[in-house]
Amino acid sequence: MCGGIRYEISEPLVGASYCHCTRCQRRSGNAASVSGRTTPGSLRIVQGEELLRSWSPEDGNPKVSCSRCGSQLWAEDRTQPGVYFVRLGTFDSDPGVRPSYHQFVDYAAVWEPLPDDGLPRYPERRPPTT
C-alpha cells in the first residue's frame, strides 16, 4: 500500500480464509487471496477516504481498492451490511487471526499446489455455518 488510505478495525476479526477462485487470482496476481472477516460496523476509515475506489462485479461482493496505488483492500458482504472481508496483507501488523480453511479449491492455480496444511478444503464457497 502507498499509505494514502489508513483504516482501523475496532474489534477482533472473526475468522480468515484462503480464496482460490479465479477472480481473486486475477485481481491479486497470486494463487489465492487471504482475507479476514470483520464484525458489523467495526471498520473505520482514518485517512484517505477520497482515495477509495469501489466497484461491484456482476457475480461477487462489492470491492474496494486504493485509486492511487491499486491495492485491493476489502470486499463488502452483500448479505450483511457493515461486514467486510479485509485483505490480511493490508494490515500494518499482525491481524490477530489465521486462515482456518480454503475455499474454491476446484479453481486453484495449477502452477502452485495447495499447501498440505491440514485446513478444511471446500470445492466452492464454504457452506454457511450454523
Residue ranges: model-predicted function:
Residues 1-130:
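A short Gly-Trp-Pro
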